[in-house]
């Protein structure tokens, strides 16, 4: 940190924040976290909100599937959080009091270990930092820890996303799929595609988020910052908005890759279909919950990616689906007999800033701390097999 300890209200915040920063972003020890002065100079330009909004109270599950999920069209659904306890409980003041001594993940170190900070220190940091791209709570295990699992009781999965087929896999085997998300202005997520072909929903309880979504057919080298643009924050949402966003808004941007832009507000739930590029930045402090999921509508996309990226999981998963959802086997068979769908990603989101990720080679490499583009996990097995051949034969062998 470039400024002194007197910025914070708690005497230990400076030390705790410095420790977390050294672990999560050691490359910034010499360069500094405030060097670019974004807290004073960064402003999002005016834009036209182009996403469709629908009232969740007047939308049936079948209408959602027909109009949005099946054709893979992003949408904001309103009214889904109206009856959540989180609507009242998830304020900065209440969370910082109730969970003040609980640790939350705000990054990862170079070995892939979680970097955590107590809520009371993060709260102090969030309200008083001037970092260019601040630390961001993106915690995937909050519902599994005894002292924070009550957060999962404050909301319910909306009816449109309840049929998550990964539920049939053991909790210990399935990838991380839900995150408690909290962060200040300028934190966010670098451009990415969600892992394993999953779709996602993100319900915002506090603050505002700016989203840009780009169609799946857009090539990776077009939507990512160029090498000379990456600077000291190559995998941060704020870097994307300072570089690529200017091209996206220019008249020369290809019309077939036309983006959808929106400003998500409290009580709104974003639906991100499988394969869509998306980048998010917080305009102010925000609190949200987000889930990734597999449904009947995107199973044909998720299955081949799971076989390729998580073969052990896929073998376990297909056995469970055979036992409990046998009507889905035809979808899996069809998906196994065709080449993996191409998202134009040749190397496998949530930056010290939102989204999940995986080791699959055709998604952006994002960990569940919000950091994109960094380290990868090793595939669990058979990762060098031809994916097309593997999809067909692996399905057959999994049922033996």
From Swiss-Prot:
Q: Where is this region: Disordered?
A: 342-400
Q: Which domain of life is it from?
A: Eukaryota
Gene for this chain: psr-1
Q: What is its main location?
A: nucleus
- Reported cofactor(s): Fe(2+)
Tell me the residue numbers annotated for binding 2-oxoglutarate: 202, 290
**UniProt miscellaneous comment:** Worms lacking psr-1 display more cell corpses than in wild-type animals.
Which Pfam families does the record match to this protein? JmjC
What's the protein here called? Answer: Bifunctional arginine demethylase and lysyl-hydroxylase psr-1
Ranges in a coiled coil: none
Q: Which organism is it from?
A: Caenorhabditis elegans
Q: Which residues bind Fe cation?
A: 192, 194, 278
């Amino acid at each position: 940190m470039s400024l002194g300890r007197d910025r914070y209200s708690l005497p230990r915040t400076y030390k705790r924040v410095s420790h977390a920063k050294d672990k999560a972003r050691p490359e910034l020890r010499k360069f500094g976290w405030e060097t670019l002065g974004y807290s004073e100079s960064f402003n999002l330009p005016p834009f036209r909100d182009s996403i469709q909004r629908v009232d969740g109270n007047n939308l049936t599950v079948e209408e959602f599937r027909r109009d949005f999920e099946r054709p893979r069209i992003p949408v904001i659904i309103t009214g889904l959080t109206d009856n959540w306890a989180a609507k009242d409980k998830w304020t900065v003041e209440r969370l910082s009091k109730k969970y003040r001594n609980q640790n939350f993940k705000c990054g990862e170190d170079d070995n892939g270990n979680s970097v955590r900070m107590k809520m009371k220190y993060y709260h102090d940091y969030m309200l008083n930092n001037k970092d260019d791209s601040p630390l961001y709570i993106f915690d995937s295990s909050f519902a599994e820890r005894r002292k924070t699992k009550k957060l999962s009781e404050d909301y319910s999965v909306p009816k449109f996303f309840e049929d998550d087929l990964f539920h049939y896999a053991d909790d210990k085997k399935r990838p991380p799929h839900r995150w408690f998300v909290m962060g200040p202005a300028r934190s966010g997520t670098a451009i990415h595609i969600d892992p394993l072909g999953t779709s996602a929903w993100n319900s915002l309880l506090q603050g505002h988020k700016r989203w840009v979504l780009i169609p799946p057919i857009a090539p990776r080298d077009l939507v990512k910052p160029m090498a000379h643009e990456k600077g000291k924050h190559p995998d941060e949402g704020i870097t994307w908005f300072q570089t690529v966003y200017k091209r996206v808004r220019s008249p020369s941007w290809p019309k077939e890759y036309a983006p959808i832009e929106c400003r998500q507000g409290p009580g709104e739930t974003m639906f991100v279909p499988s394969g869509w590029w998306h980048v998010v930045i917080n305009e102010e402090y925000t609190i949200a919950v987000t889930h990734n999921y597999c449904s009947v509508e995107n199973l044909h996309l998720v299955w081949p990616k799971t076989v390729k990226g998580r073969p052990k999981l896929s073998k376990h998963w297909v056995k469970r689906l055979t036992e409990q959802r046998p009507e889905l086997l035809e979808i899996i068979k069809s998906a196994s007999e065709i080449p993996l769908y191409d998202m134009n990603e040749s190397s496998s989101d949530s930056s010290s800033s939102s989204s999940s990720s995986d080791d699959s080679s055709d998604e952006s490499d994002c960990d569940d701390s919000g950091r994109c583009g960094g380290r990868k996990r090793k595939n669990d097995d058979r990762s060098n097999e031809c994916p097309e051949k593997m999809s067909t034969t692996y399905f057959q062998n999994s049922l033996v």
